[in-house]
């Protein structure tokens, strides 16, 4: 269903998603955000941070992609996948809030994760970048800390033909005055 709502699979840019985020009243988030980008190793980094922060006593939300078996794997709270009913409620709320704004599959999922984290009252949300960083949907919220795991030639049609261009796109998740690794 979500795949039919947008004419393109990838549509880099943040304004459409920001409008829906505001309509959902999810800005600013009530939790700390850590954004993880890079070419390879993002999922492993998210899993490590998630485990470490939970061991320290934090309530943690983690958003990753793609999923392996079930969509619900993408959104976890304290390492438990959100259930179908919660996802359906959230998707319906996003669909109503978007009005005539088209959202990609990934943008829908990102908004669903942010909504679920808000609803669950997480302390920290770890968001994995889907593509690039600067114009990726997870970049609609300002991260308190951002990590770029690696930079290699990937998605050159979207991010640029060399490591410098790709690095620039991935570095777009950093915020002035906030820790970056």
Predicted regions and their residues:
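Internal gly/pro-rich beta-alpha loop/helix module
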Residues: 144, 158-181
């Amino acid at each position: 269903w979500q795949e039919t709502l947008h004419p393109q699979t990838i549509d880099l840019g943040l304004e459409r998603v920001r409008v829906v985020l505001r309509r959902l009243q999810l800005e600013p988030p009530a939790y700390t955000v850590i954004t993880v980008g890079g070419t390879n190793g993002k999922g492993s980094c998210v899993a490590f941070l998630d485990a470490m922060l939970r061991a320290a006593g934090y309530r943690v939300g983690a958003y990753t992609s793609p999923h392996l078996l079930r969509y619900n794997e993408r959104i976890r709270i304290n390492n438990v996948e959100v259930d179908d009913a919660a996802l359906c409620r959230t998707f319906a709320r996003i669909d109503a809030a978007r009005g005539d704004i088209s959202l990609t599959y990934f943008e829908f999922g990102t908004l669903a994760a942010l909504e679920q984290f808000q609803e669950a009252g997480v302390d920290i949300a770890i968001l994995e970048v889907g593509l690039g960083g600067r114009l990726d949907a997870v970049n609609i919220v300002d991260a308190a800390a951002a990590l770029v795991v690696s930079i290699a030639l990937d998605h050159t049609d979207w991010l640029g033909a060399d490591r410098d261009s790709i690095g620039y796109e991935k570095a777009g998740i950093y915020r002035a005055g906030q820790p970056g690794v």
